[in-house]
């Protein structure tokens, strides 16, 4: 039996703040997400979900928050380096913490990192065009 990745989720403190961030990032978060404790979004063949700590505690009451360093990195691909740079400027302009300003990792790959409202690192990536 082949193993397949089915879901990736983020446990959030405040659904309103999380939904707002991920919408600004470009994720098609449902319009009623703020009134929910768990929302699922189908993306690129898998399901991305946001779930409140309160909802998660029902399934895993002994779980405690991680501390220090990365808990998870979510990578979202943008089609151009200009789109990556613009998205980084947009998100940091709204007050989200820019963890790492846009930079070229290799001659063909560009990265930037922004922290979501819960401190999860979101990696933005794009291919760099060769002229």
Q: What is the predicted function of each stretch?
A:
Residues 1-6, 28-81, 85-115, 126-131:
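Vicinal oxygen chelate
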Residues 9:
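Polyanion-binding surface elements
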Residues 16-17, 86:
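Alpha-helical macromolecular-interaction surfaces
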Residues 18-23, 91, 119:
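Conserved active-site tyrosine of GNAT-family acetyltransferases
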Residues 121-124:
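Short glycine-/small-residue motifs
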């Amino acid at each position: 039996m082949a193993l397949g990745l089915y879901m990736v989720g983020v446990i959030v403190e405040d659904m309103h703040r999380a939904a707002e961030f991920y919408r600004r990032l470009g994720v098609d978060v449902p319009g009623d997400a703020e009134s929910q404790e768990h929302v699922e979004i189908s993306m690129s063949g898998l399901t991305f979900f946001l779930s409140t700590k309160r909802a998660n505690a029902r399934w895993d009451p002994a779980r405690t928050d991680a501390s220090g360093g990365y808990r998870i990195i979510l990578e979202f691909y943008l089609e151009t380096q200009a789109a990556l740079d613009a998205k980084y400027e947009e998100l940091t302009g709204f007050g989200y913490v820019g963890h790492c300003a846009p930079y070229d990792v290799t001659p063909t790959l560009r990265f930037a990192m922004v922290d979501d409202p819960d401190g999860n690192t979101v990696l933005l990536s794009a291919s760099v065009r060769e002229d």
